[in-house]
Amino acid sequence: MYLHRKILGAVTAAAIMGFAANAQAQIEIQWWHAMGGALGETVNDIAEGFNNSQTDYVLKAIYKGNYTETMTAGIAAFRSGVPPHIMQVFEVGTATMMAAKGAIYPVYQLMADQGMPFDESRYLSAVIGYYTTTEGKLLSMPFNSSTPVVFWNKQAFAAAGLDRAPKTWGEMGEFSAKIIASGGAACGFTVGWQSWSMLENFSAWHDVSFATKENGFAGLDTELVFNSPLHVKTIGQLADWQKDKIFTYGGRRGDGNPLFAEGKCAMLINSSAYYSGLRKSTAFDFGTSELPYWSDVAAAPQNSIIGGATLWVLRGHDDKDYKGVAQFMSYLSDVFVQTFWHQNTGYVPITNAAYELTQRSGYYEQNEGRDVAIIQMSARTPTSNSKGLRLGNFVQIRDIINDELEAIWAGSKTTQQGLDDAVSRGNKLLRKFERSY
């Protein structure tokens, strides 16, 4: 509550300044986003805070549907000559946005053009690395960043005589079997956003390639390689575990969350962003821990990569508009704004200062597990395999991966066949993207 007041506390002063000054029309800045429900309300709080911090601009936060719908609407608006100033785009759209050079206004360039102080070293390297040029220049402003973690039901674990989360994939199987045998839960674990959790982040966590050319960072001629023996071993293990309910497939996105929230599965591998929602929907205490790894992989654990979205600035507006956009980007990076966003959602702060402030405040001691995502992303220096993914047509590639994983779970394809087919089909889309740019 203190942080909310801190952000919005400028309302009185701003209002007084507004009444005292000569009446002038404020310049409207449109921010199209994909945050619905409670997250959308928090977005509105941030917009309100910015509006109350100055009198020249009014920021309109406009919900445009899910990530895909928002990105599609923004692209269509740009082509029609009426783009929003700011558009929220999920991480899989990064390569597409980068390729649209005439449409985007890179954040580092925006801030320089508008004379706004901008120090990229302020930001968590694990967060901004996904969205920078090869020279380390930030293209879009990270906003809602998260990473997959393991949520575990302490009550179900206690029933099996367990008091900690599994650390390795071997323990995932062992602990799940004990919990099921004890009656603590009917299922060991489920997974959400399976391509992101079980292939993209699995690869980074084990420091192996998801795709060649540094996962696409080093060139458009990248190729998918997530059909390696290690990937086949892991996905095959999950497929085998289905027989004993150690693993249960719950759906492509957050569809499996109720299996955990209702106590049916003892563990959930999904985005750290679900933390707040799970706290409200579960009747039991749960912990948060790092992703499991194979103990025989020397490089593991490395670091996980982020999901979520960033804010891209679009071309097509007057310079005076962009001055306000730059002011908002600066406001968004404020330590109190970032701390408010982090503590009121499951997303990580994007600045080192916000993380340090939250540490000093004792928040993590009072909210066990809220720092796991940050530690998991930041404890080790990212490698070429673990700094992120930059692949064209990645939205469609993820759909292909989901199709093939579901064929594996259903038993209609072997693990090797399913992953081979996903790689082959995905590479065709990469070649199509390469030819386009």
Language-model segments: residues:
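Glycine-centered hinge/linker elements that transmit conformational signals in sensory
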Residues: 176-180, 219-250
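Extracytoplasmic/periplasmic substrate-recognition and gating elements
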Residues: 53, 160, 232, 236, ...
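Short, solvent-exposed loop/beta-turn-alpha elements that line the ligand-binding surface or hinge
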Residues: 108-123, 208-233, 280-281, 293-303, ...
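Hinge/lid segment of periplasmic solute-binding proteins
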Residues: 90-147, 167, 173, 200-204, ...
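C-terminal capping/gating helix-and-loop segments adjacent to ligand/active sites or protein-protein/ligand interfaces
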Residues: 369-425
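Extracytoplasmic "Venus flytrap"/periplasmic binding protein-like
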Residues: 45, 49, 53-123, 155-167, ...
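A structural signal for short loop-to-beta-strand junctions that line the ligand-binding cleft
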Residues: 76, 84-85, 116-156, 187, ...
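Extracytoplasmic/periplasmic solute-binding protein
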Residues: 132-143, 148, 173-223, 265
